[in-house]
């Protein structure tokens, strides 16, 4: 668990982190927040129960560098689904930013955040 990016993660993930800190300057914003089950949120705002996930191309396409084989790719997809399910059960809003629809400003990101509903479980 870290409060800053320290050059870990994709460049767009670090950009999103900087946007979230600008959107919520008075709130704690955590980078690569470790969940009890070993999964991580890319960016987490605990006070609001909001998680921002940057989904690089490997989240929607098989890429050998990331997955090694198709089983690895399928495991990655299942992991994303499991993270969403766990988040729903705990009332955490998951905002996914896909690599091919990256936002370009804090204002754009805020619009996306506000367009996603909290889970109703």
Per-region residue spans from a language model:
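Nucleic-acid endo/exonuclease domains
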Residues: 1-121
